[in-house]
Every structure is written in structure tokens, then in C-alpha cells.
């Protein structure tokens, strides 16, 4: 999935409806992307693993400790980061949307290769997602 659909949605909504963008990258080599982000999303909180692009840290470091009312978080990234995001906002999980990545052999739900555990039973990322609320994913049962 990656960040492209989320950035597209943010641009379409306009910054009047987007409270902020927090982005994490690996480090060197992402300078061009970082410049585009700064131009496209003024005030973007940019983080990198080594501090060479933006501030040293992760995208989670750019988020508030508590979600303001009527605010949603849209996120994509490594499973560990999404798990940490769900843990950061345990009582607001319904307002945290996570775009999950999974190997999808058939892409139509038949092979069950992309199944994840949720509060509503096993769900297929390819046809039931890829976006889920953070509260519905059973992160402790999710294989790394």
C-alpha cells in the first residue's frame, strides 16, 4: 500500500481538513522526497532513523500524546509501527485507521494468504481491507 494513497487523500482533502502529516523515512537518499513533502504539506513533521532527513526518530514522535476530538489518524508502515500506534491510542482505536500490507497471492480472497486476526474473526487484507481500524486488529495474535 505505502504512503502514496494516504498522501493523495490528504492532498485531495486539502490542508484545511488535514491537521498534520507525520512521515518517517529510513534516512539518506530520501532528501528529494523530503523536499516534495515540505512543499506539498507545510508543517510536515519529518523523521528519519538516523536524523539525516528531518529529526531523528519515527513518525509516531510527530503525533500528539492524545487525539483531539473529531480527529482521525490514517497510517501505513511496518507492522511494528502500526502496533505501536494502536498502543499509543488504546481508547481511540476506532479513530485510528491502518492500511495493512500483506502478500496477496490471488488478490481476490480465495487463497487466504493475506488473512489477519481481528475482533470479527479472520479477515482478508485483499478484499476486507486493506484499511482496518486499529482497535479491530488483534495485534497480539498478528504474526510478525
Task: Name each model feature, range by range.
Residues 1-101:
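FNR/FR-type flavoprotein reductase catalytic core
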Residues 31-35, 55-61, 108-114, 131-136:
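Low-complexity, flexible helical/coil segments
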Residues 70, 96, 121-122, 143-144:
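Short secondary-structure transition/capping segments
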Residues 34, 86, 124-127, 139:
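A generic "cationic amphipathic patch" detector
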Residues 127-144:
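Short microdomains enriched in Cys/His and/or Lys/Arg
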Residues 13-16, 34, 115, 121, ...:
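Hydrophobic alpha-helical segments
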Residues 3-8, 79-81, 101-131:
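Local cysteine-cluster metal-coordination motifs and their immediate loop/turn environment
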Amino acid at each position: 500500500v505505502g504512503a502514496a494513497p494516504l498522501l493523495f487523500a490528504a492532498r485531495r482533502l486539502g490542508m484545511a481538513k488535514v491537521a498534520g502529516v507525520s512521515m518517517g523515512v529510513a534516512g539518506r537518499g530520501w532528501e528529494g522526497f523530503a523536499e516534495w513533502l515540505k512543499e506539498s504539506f507545510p508543517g510536515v513533521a519529518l523523521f528519519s532513523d538516523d536524523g539525516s532527513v528531518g529529526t531523528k526518530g519515527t513518525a509516531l514522535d510527530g503525533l500528539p500524546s492524545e487525539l483531539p476530538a473529531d480527529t482521525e489518524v490514517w497510517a501505513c508502515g511496518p507492522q511494528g509501527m502500526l502496533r505501536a500506534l494502536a498502543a499509543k491510542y488504546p481508547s481511540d482505536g476506532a479513530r485510528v485507521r491502518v492500511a495493512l500490507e500483506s502478500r496477496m497471492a490471488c488478490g481476490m480472497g480465495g487463497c487466504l494468504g493475506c488473512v489477519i486476526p481481528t475482533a470479527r474473526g479472520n479477515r482478508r487484507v485483499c478484499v476486507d481491507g486493506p484499511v482496518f481500524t486499529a482497535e479491530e486488529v488483534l495485534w497480539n495474535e498478528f504474526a510478525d
